[in-house]
Structure formats: structure tokens, C-alpha cells
């Protein structure tokens, strides 16, 4: 068994062991009602959901950007050994990957500016508006984070191919760059959808 397969199996076993332990404890102490999804959604603060959305927006976007830069950068450095001329021109791919992280930062700032304080602590007093705002911010952060994660990987793989193709045949660079531009638009789609998700958000008393 390889190291990666061992890691996956360890995570799988640990997850189900924790789930079993929690289930047994809840059964013994008569806390089974806490498995109720509605209870969980109403007892958690909308601020938790909004902060989770902010964290997911920035963290997943940065992971996507870093992953894409890693994939592209290694190919540029490797191909630049044989064809040094590709190093400067293919930095465009690195910029496209970095733009993915910028999308996440922008959306995190937008979401954080929408979070307004409220004085209520009881679920009924908090109201549907604040819960809707918290869930919308979480959904927006998850949307932009996941779209930027896959966008970064997409741009990184295409940028890697562009660097290696340019090293072999310079006329291929512009053609592959068009594919890379369309790949980078995936992250922009995520930002647009996230803005639409939070367009009706109103939090506060």
C-alpha cells in the first residue's frame, strides 16, 4: 500500500470512528435530538455561517491559485532549461492563477461588509432575515471558493501545457492562451453567482 492510499484509508477510518463515538455518546446521554438538522440550523448563529463563507471564499481561492502556480511554475522552470525564451512570456499564466486568489479576496471583503451586528440571541427573535443572510453568505463563499479552486487547477494545467508547447513550437502559444482565458473565466462566473446570491442580504436588527 502506497503512502497516499494509507493516508486516505487512515482518514476514512478516523472519520467513521469519530462518527461512531459521537453516536454512542449521544445515545447513552439521551442527546439524540441533536442529530436534528433543523435544530442545528436554528441554534447556530448567522454570524458563524457568514464567517464560514468568508473563510471558504479566501481559503479555497488561495488553494486554487497556489495549486495552479505550482503546476504552471514547475513546467515553466523545466521548459526554460531547454528554451529560456519561454520564461518571460509564460508569466501570463502565473498572473491568471494569481487572479483567482484576488477573486476570493474581493468576495470575502464583499461578504464581510454585509455582516451587521444584531442584539437578539433567541432563534425566534433573530428572525428569518438574519438566518437567510447568514446562509446566503455561506453559500456565496462556498460558491466562489469552489469555483476558484477548480479554476486555479484548470488554469494551471492549461498554463503548463502552454509553456511546454511554446518551448517546442512558439506558434502554439497564442492558440493555447485563448483556451487559458476561457478557463480563467470560470472563476469570474463564480464571483458573479456569489454576488447574485448575496444581492438581497440584509442582516441586523
UniProtKB/Swiss-Prot annotation:
Record topological domains on the Lumenal side: 1-3, 73-90, 159-175
GO molecular function, one term: proton-transporting ATPase activity, rotational mechanism
Membrane topology: Multi-pass membrane protein
Sorted UniProt keywords: Cytoplasmic vesicle, Hydrogen ion transport, Ion transport, Membrane, Transmembrane, Transmembrane helix, Transport
Function description: Proton-conducting pore forming subunit of the V0 complex of vacuolar(H+)-ATPase (V-ATPase), a multisubunit enzyme composed of a peripheral complex (V1) that hydrolyzes ATP and a membrane integral complex (V0) that translocates protons. V-ATPase is responsible for acidifying and maintaining the pH of intracellular compartments and in some cell types, is targeted to the plasma membrane, where it is responsible for acidifying the extracellular environment.
Species lineage: Eukaryota, Metazoa, Chordata, Craniata, Vertebrata
Site (Essential for proton translocation): 98
Pfam families: ATP-synt_C
Protein's UniProt name: V-type proton ATPase 21 kDa proteolipid subunit c''
